[in-house]
Structure formats: C-alpha cells, structure tokens
Curated annotation (Swiss-Prot):
Cofactor binding: number and manner: Binds 1 Fe(3+) ion per subunit. The iron ion 1 is coordinated via 4 cysteine residues.
Stated name of the protein: Desulfoferrodoxin homolog
Keywords: Electron transport, Iron, Metal-binding, Transport
Needed cofactors: Fe(3+); Cu(2+)
Organism, scientific name: Archaeoglobus fulgidus (strain ATCC 49558 / DSM 4304 / JCM 9628 / NBRC 100126 / VC-16)
C-alpha cells in the first residue's frame, strides 16, 4: 500500500516516482517491485544532504547542506522540493547547477526535501 508523497525508485532502470494518489497496489517497474526511498533527516554526511531552509516573508530559499553538496556528473542533487500546506513545489537540477532553489509559499509552516542520486531522499522542517 502506498501513501501520498512517498518516493519510490526502480532499482533496474532508475525511474523515480512520487505518489500523488495513495493506492492498495504495489508499484512495479521493469517487472520488479519499486523500492520505497526512506526519508533521512540525520545520518552520516548530514552536512551535505539535509536541506537548509531560509525564509524572507513568503519567499523560501533552500540550499542542500550546510556544506554545499557536490553537483558532479556522477554525484548530484536531482531535485529540491518544498511542501507548503499540502502543495508541492519542485525544482529539477542537473550536474553543474548550484544545489539551491527559491520558492514562493503561502503558509507559515514548510518543509523541504532533496534527492541525491547516490544517497537518496533527505528532509528538513
């Protein structure tokens, strides 16, 4: 059974999906069950993976890590998203980009997630 906002990865082809509607079935890709990406908040490498949120009014600035995360061809942040009162705002990134994003939000309480192509899903807030 899936839950809204869970992230799954195909360990065969690398497809990544985020659940937008919960269901009872199992997510399958390439003939194999997809792997649920567990959300990490603290662990080894925290200084380079946990999103750091700064706020000025309704502007939210997110950078990945208190020490900038590498953005190299083999190791980079694929996306950053902010969850704002049920709304999801996402910025896709690629190697060479800076590991940061800016969003306009309406609620007072937000959280941020970032996905590292090697170390998985990280969250703060």
């Amino acid at each position: 059974m899936t839950e809204v906002m869970q992230v799954y990865k195909c360990m065969v082809c690398g497809n990544i999906v985020e659940v937008v509607h919960a269901g009872r079935g199992q997510l399958v890709c390439c003939g194999q069950p997809m792997k649920l990406m567990e959300v990490k908040t603290t662990d080894e490498g925290k200084e380079k993976h946990v999103p750091v949120i700064e706020r000025e009014g309704n502007k939210v600035y997110v950078k990945v890590g208190s020490v900038a995360h590498p953005m190299e061809e083999q190791h980079y942040i694929e996306w950053i998203e902010v969850i704002d009162d049920g709304c999801v705002h996402r910025k896709q990134l690629k190697p060479g980009d800076e590991p940061k994003a800016e969003f306009t939000v309406m609620s007072d309480r937000v959280s941020a997630r970032a996905y590292c192509n090697i170390h998985g899903l990280w969250q703060s807030g």
